[in-house]
Structures are given as structure tokens and as C-alpha cells.
Amino acid sequence: LRSENVKVNVNFKCFSIVVFKLLHVMMKLFLNRLRRDHGVIVGRLSQEVANRQGIVAGHQYICDTMEREGGCLEPGEYHIMVAKCKCFARQMLFLEPIRDDSSSSLPLPETCKLCRMERKSHEFGCLEELYALPCPMMQPGNGPFRLRQGGILIGEAHASGVVLKSQERFLQLYDRMKKAMVRGSDVVVVIE
């Protein structure tokens, strides 16, 4: 009778660990900023790889990143959301900071509303105010000098300020994020 109780307790403990691991699935990305060059910050985006026991085994390279030095995000953790951007008229990867309750960042719909208003009022004039708007997202592009605050270009970094194969790399990353979210994973990027 006593050995049966031990078996039940051991099986229950294993079951609870498996259920906990299934409930808390998270995809963790790391953006390591490697160098600053002529107003550009070049980085590398990689994914944390874990073995079957859940122990981190290493990092898998995904793509290079490029940011404007004056408009880069603060180091920290950011939650990745997929939402439609009014400016690009397509689904984009938005970054939302993971902070305490005293966060002063604007919610996504308000940011997009500001973006629409700025685009309309500066259609034929200076776009400096549009680029100063905070809009943290990962996006395709050729160079970082027209990025808004918090924009991160995805692709292969070559010469100073030039990104190649950006659209291809962005679509690969977007598909990877979308599949993880459909499976119920939280996607987090750690910027270092």
C-alpha cells in the first residue's frame, strides 16, 4: 500500500512538471549590438536553443540588424506582437517593452493614430517629426537613416549603413514568429 502511494506521488510530480512546461512556452530572441559605425548600430539577432530537458544549449543565428544611433531602443526585454501597421499597410513585428506598471509608452493604436496624423500634416514638408515618433518595430529596409524611433532593420549587414536581402530575411523572421504565436508561445527579444 505504501509503495503505491509513492508511485502516485512520483507520477503526479512528473505530470505537473510536464504540464508546467507546456503552459509556459516562450521563444526567446537575443539582439546583440556589435559595433557603432558612422551613426549606425550593427547587431546580430539569434534565437535561444534549448535541449529536451529545457537547458539552454546555445544560440542559433537568424539575421543581422541595423539601427539608427540616435533612435535606438534601450537595452531590455521586449514582447513581440504582430499587428497591422497603417504606414506600411501590412502586418509588422511591433516591440512592446516589458516593464513595471509605471511604463510611459503609448499603446499600439494611439501610436498608429499619431503616425497617421503626422503623415497627413507633413506630406509635402519636412518629415523630421514623423521620424521622431516612437514606433518600435522590426522591419525590412535598405538603410537605417529614415527609420523612426525604435525601428530595427532586418537583413544582412554589409557596408556601413547598407542592408541586403532585407525583405527575404524579414519574411523568414515573420513566418517564424507567426508560427510560434499560433502554437501559443510568447515571443520575447532581449536587447543587449
Where do the language-model regions lie?
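Short, positively charged and aromatic/hydrophobic N-terminal segments
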Residues: K21-L23
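Cell wall/extracellular polymer interaction/catalysis modules
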Residues: M26-V187
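General secretory precursor processing signal
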Residues: N5-V6, I17, C115-E118
